[in-house]
A protein has these predicted regions:
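N-terminal signal-anchor/start-transfer transmembrane helix
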Residues: 11-29
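Loop-to-helix transition at the N-terminal end of transmembrane alpha-helices
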Residues: 32-48, 66-69
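Membrane-helix boundary connector in multi-pass membrane proteins
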Residues: 59-63, 81-97, 115-118
Length: 121
């Protein structure tokens, strides 16, 4: 189960990294990439799967440093902000910038979480 958690964790980091690049292109170059919203929901879905597997591992007494759990749960904030704040923004350019900033924050958090998990697996 730990290996699956690590694989999906890496996929989550990759998905949010790609999403950050896509939203950066949308925000700063004006590119219209219609599939960005689908990618956003797919990345969030991977993160949800990570939480389910992570709580399963936590329930089975798998040892991990508390900072791993704290940072992992912190990633909910920028993901939620992207889906809530950016989606309600009427100015497209501002919505894309907000999504980019939220995705960048998520990527940085997830890289830290993944690295902690990698070192303590």
């Amino acid at each position: 189960m730990v290996n699956i958690h690590m694989i999906i964790g890496l996929a989550s980091v990759a998905a949010f990294l790609l999403l950050t690049i896509v939203n950066g292109l949308r925000a700063f170059r004006g590119s219209e990439l219609s599939w960005a919203r689908g990618l956003s929901f797919a990345a969030a879905g991977l993160l949800l799967i990570q939480y389910v597997i992570g709580f399963s591992l936590l329930g089975s007494d798998h040892g991990m440093k508390p900072i791993h759990y704290i940072l992992a749960l912190t990633a909910i904030i920028p993901v939620g902000a992207e889906h809530m704040i950016a989606a309600q923004e009427t100015d497209k350019q501002r919505a894309h910038r907000t999504a980019f900033i939220c995705n960048l924050a998520t990527v940085l958090i997830l890289i830290a979480v993944y690295e902690i998990g990698q070192r303590n697996a």
